[in-house]
Amino acid sequence: MAAANDYIVRDIGLADYGRKEISIAETEMPGLMATRAEYGASQPLKGAKIAGSLHMTIQTAVLIETLKHLGADIRWVSCNIYSTQDHAAAAIAAAGIPVFAVKGETLTEYWDYTSKLFDWHDGGMPNMILDDGGDATMFVHLGLRAENGDTAFLDKPESEEEEVFFALLKKKLAEKPKGWFAGLADSIKGVSEETTTGVHRLYNLAKEGKLLFPAINVNDSVTKSKFDNLYGCKESLVDGIRRGTDVMMAGKVAMVAGFGDVGKGSAASLRNAGCRVLVSEIDPICALQAAMEGYEVVTMEEAAPRADIFVTATGNKDIITIEHMRAMKDRAIVCNIGHFDNEIQVAGLKNLKWQNIKPQVDEIEFADGHRIILLSEGRLVNLGNATGHPSFVMSASFTNQTLAQIELWTNPGKYERQVYTLPKTLDEKVAALHLEKIGVKLSKLRPDQAAYIGVSQNGPFKPEHYRY
């Protein structure tokens, strides 16, 4: 149980409002509700102490309460300074679950809250991490690295965020007894990671032989990446831009940087709103896909003076540079739907004239007098300026997260310090849990048909190498 007032939220009085929306979301999240029904009695997460770092939304509240229903003890923070829905955080706090999340956190607050994940109210430590973007995971890894004597990197931050993060690590190293980070790393039995950026971090750590505990890559489950990343962005991107700007989308020229799953959903979102969509890509396969879908594939240099709306969706840095923004039309809209804010060179804009229009909407004026409108300071536009993906598509992602937590917790000897994905049988199970809600009726293979194509009548129906 949580200690009294073991939370930081904007207004606990919003809890009733949050609870009403959580109730509605539960109806739209059949995968999570089915998981509660299947595993509730057996309590597979009993004894698990989960440190969760994932956008504190209404949908995440349903995930948190599912984990609790399955026996877990939980502490939670948001993984983005703008993505918290304050009424969702209040409802979770009122339910007795420690949560530290406020929409519009400073970077100092963000990293302070993240550190609270690891200070359990009873003096203990978490033994599981549920992560989105990898910040909680990196807290453990970089903290242990510094504790072991390699501290030079703490004096060489490469961004404002790293400056704040490294200052926090120095503070923790001074406060905690020697060996605290080592004990924390030993305590963690595994991590499940939600998003592309965090997965890249995990694979890099594993490649270097530095991963401290087993990891499950939830992002690359088909029922996550091909649904959350694609269909979620298809609905939430334009929602964020409209709430931020009230701009007429139809007839505008929009530029999407990147044509992976997130880029595909983003381009479709803009096209469905009536935009003429340009796409940039480095990968010839993705570029060909974009062209075959009817998008004009150009470079950012070509698009900068042409487009009215710019969206980055690459997971890479410096995609929209200061020079690109100098070349844009007056009051071009610039935003990002990738996990981190470095896809746009926001740091290079700080010495220009800023005018805040409303929360998460800023107008920035260049020396020549032309302006851009920047949404969510280059952070996730769909969560900063709107409320993120709809509940139904998040149910699939979060059912994968729940199954990954169960797998890591109940089979601790099965996994080494590597990155794994969930088996296709579970992917198909997650999809199946969502069919009845939308009226889908599956066909059934006859025994002779199953034998003909070499699969079981009950699946899995595709080989592991199949690309959906």
Swiss-Prot record:
Pathway in which the depicted protein is active: Amino-acid biosynthesis; L-homocysteine biosynthesis; L-homocysteine from S-adenosyl-L-homocysteine: step 1/1
InterPro entries in alphabetical order: Adenosylhomocyst_ase-like_sf, Adenosylhomocysteinase-like, Ado_hCys_hydrolase_NAD-bd, NAD(P)-bd_dom_sf, S-Ado-L-homoCys_hydrolase_CS
Gene3D superfamilies: Adenosylhomocysteinase-like (3.40.50.1480), NAD(P)-binding Rossmann-like Domain (3.40.50.720)
Record's cofactor remark: Binds 1 NAD(+) per subunit.
Main subcellular localisation: cytoplasm
Positions bound to substrate: 57, 132, 194, 224, 228
Any single biological process term in GO: S-adenosylmethionine cycle
Location within or outside the cell: Cytoplasm
EC id: 3.13.2.1
Family: Belongs to the adenosylhomocysteinase family.
Entries under PANTHER family matching the protein: ADENOSYLHOMOCYSTEINASE
Protein name according to UniProt: Adenosylhomocysteinase
Organism: Methylorubrum populi (strain ATCC BAA-705 / NCIMB 13946 / BJ001)
